[in-house]
Amino acid sequence: MLSSALGNAAILRRFIVLVAAATFSMFTLWAVVREMIDAPPGDYEVRQGDIMLGDGKFEGAIGRFDAALAVSPEHRGAMMGRAIALLELGRVDEAEQAFSDLIAFLSRSLAADDPTGLAVLAAGFANRGILRDRDGRHEAALADYRQALAIDAGAVDGPGLFHKIVYGDAKPSTIANRADYIEAQLALPEDQRLLRVPELDARQRMHKP
């Protein structure tokens, strides 16, 4: 009789554990589903794309950003992420056009009381500047950097903790520092300019508010 009682207690404990695990799983699933339902169209896909960007899976990231744009054609996070992924893949012309399209869209549609939108616009100019800088078009890069700083200097002050962890760089190059450097170099006679410093250029990171 005692062994039977002990056996029943063990069965009851297993049942309680299984029910608790099932309940936790259902709440987790429901939280994910609610997040997908409650989020604005395209946000879930953009978060997936951002994760892939951080993992260096640029083709996959473009797929998720395209999926976001399919349901929300003016999703600025998707537009920005897609442009960054194109640049990281070396598809420079497509990336530049994507940044320019984002800048044009925000310039004509942005409300003055939209600080997040202003941060994205500043990042768009900063990222296009980085693209042009890497491509050797330093005057155009400088113009983009200055425009980014004029719109929202704080938004392009430098990549945050996420980038420092992902890229292992505690002191990434900032837009302001790079703009000052280019401006100083362009003021020199052409044969004295040093506009490419590979170890410093490698510290430049894309900006995605």
State each model region's role.
Residues 38-71:
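Alpha-helical segment of the N-proximal tetratricopeptide repeat
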Residues 2-12, 16, 157-209:
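Terminal, low-structured helical/coil segments at or just beyond the last alpha-helical repeat
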Residues 47, 81, 120, 127, ...:
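Canonical tetratricopeptide repeat
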Residues 78, 112, 124, 157-158, ...:
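TPR alpha-solenoid repeat register
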